[in-house]
Amino acid sequence: MRANVELDHATLVRFSPDCRAFIVWLANGDTLRVFKMTKREDGGYTFTATPEDFPKKHKAPIINIAIADTGKFIMTASSDTTLLIWNLRGRVLSTINTNQMNNTYAAISPCSRFVASCGFTPDVKVWEVCFGKKGDFQEVTRAFELKGHSAAVHCFAFSNDSRRMASVSKDGTWRLWDTDVEYKQQQDPYLLRTGRYEEASTMLCRLALSPDGQVLALASGSSIHVYNTRRGEKEECFEQVHGQCITDLSFDITGRYLASCGDRAVRLFHNAPGHRAVVEEMQGLLKRASNESTRQRLQQQLTRAQEALKSLGALKQ
């Protein structure tokens, strides 16, 4: 299916959770446009723009847009210090001033509870987007911050359950955090691991965290470096993947693949480090398993991961 962006073009695209609609950021219009799936007379389907675009609210270039997996709200972020939370009909629910001098990245957590941003300051700020039992929006409140970097933060990412976060900074380090904390009781996230990534000192970086939080991918320029977060060690390095700088990096929802975007192309990589991480985890759990049923279940997972590595020619003896 194709959708025409009349008298403009899109710079960012995000699908709704059910994939029956998507939003785009208009390059010339400087606002959001919604496209919904509609049925044609011949029985096929197409995407049609809604009658009205969202109102213009941002005063600086946009850096990211996102739709919550619950479908309850949309986030837009600009390069000044502004994050906007919208309902699906184009009404601003909340305006967030990040106080980070400028934003470099912003995102919604996979659980849809949080929005977060990073920028010129050496931290990542996270807010909770609160809804009532009936699904009505209530407020946006501060949740927690990731503190410890000594320079601006380029990018961050959540694990699929939002219990882990990773960040990469201009100080030349990446960090893995335990964010499964009682933030309403003022409990701060725990630092689990720190690793060196010197390229971050001189170049803008993109970061992706696997759904289970066990693999971290970092992109700078046209190269990708992949780390095991349990050990903090680099496992893979893909040089000159694209002819131009990589603009985005993401794991698929299963964690089996890593995708990179650049020079008008998307490239897919098998997540062999992810399978190795599962092998390490299952071997450790097997040593501590106390009953046979648990051992059988763990052995099955171990075997599947080993078979996946063997099929990729990546099984280390």
Q: PLM features: residue spans?
A:
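Structured C-terminal portions of repeat-based eukaryotic scaffold domains
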Residues: Q186-E198, C205-A208, Q214-C245, S250-D252, ...
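Conserved strand-to-loop turn within each blade of WD40 beta-propeller repeats
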Residues: W25-N28, A77-D80, C118-T121, V168-D171, ...
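WD40-repeat beta-propellers
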Residues: L32-T38, L83-N87, V124-V129, W174-T179, ...
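Terminal intrinsically disordered, low-complexity extensions flanking WD-repeat/beta-propeller proteins
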Residues: E236-C237, Q244-C245, D252-Y257, D263-Q317
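Canonical WD40 repeat/beta-propeller blade segments in eukaryotic WD-repeat proteins
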Residues: L7-F15, K59-I67, M101-I108, A151-A157, ...
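Inter-blade linker and blade-boundary elements of WD-repeat/beta-propeller domains
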Residues: M1-H9, K39-K59, V92-T104, F131-G148, ...
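Residue-level detector of Asp-centered blade-edge/turn motifs that repeat once per structural unit
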Residues: P17-D18, D69-T70, P110-C111, N160-D161, ...
